[in-house]
């Protein structure tokens, strides 16, 4: 028997509600990256935006390859947020999900490199 791969991991209706709200409030960098991921534009991979999984909401998620892409603003530079992000990444790794993090600036200024990195993680 094969192990069940996480898709939403029993995310609650509250988490789904937050995810839907976040779709309407994406940052400029998230919108920019989404335009390059949506509709299987990157290597024919299906990405979802603001995807709920367990108690988390992933900026972008490719279930087929178990890859999460997070776009971080400046708030993620604080010690508290770095620790929170590390814990979140650890938990997602326990579920078999690889997490890639980029800054808003990397997405806006180095999109080609960002997309190449995502492709390499999704092999």
Can you describe what each PLM-predicted range is?
Residues 1-45, 123:
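Solvent-exposed, charged helical/coil patches
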């Amino acid at each position: 028997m094969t192990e069940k791969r996480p898709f939403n991991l029993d995310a609650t209706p509250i988490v789904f509600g937050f995810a839907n709200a976040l779709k309407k409030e994406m940052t400029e960098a998230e919108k920019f990256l989404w335009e390059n991921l949506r509709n299987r534009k990157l290597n024919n991979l299906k990405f979802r935006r603001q995807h709920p999984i367990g108690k988390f909401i992933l900026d972008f998620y490719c279930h087929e390859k178990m890859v999460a892409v997070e776009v971080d603003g400046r708030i993620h530079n604080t010690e508290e947020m770095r620790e929170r992000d590390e814990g979140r990444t650890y938990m997602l790794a326990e579920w078999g999900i690889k997490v890639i993090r980029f800054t808003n600036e990397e997405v806006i200024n180095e999109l080609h490199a960002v997309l190449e990195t995502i492709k390499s993680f999704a092999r």
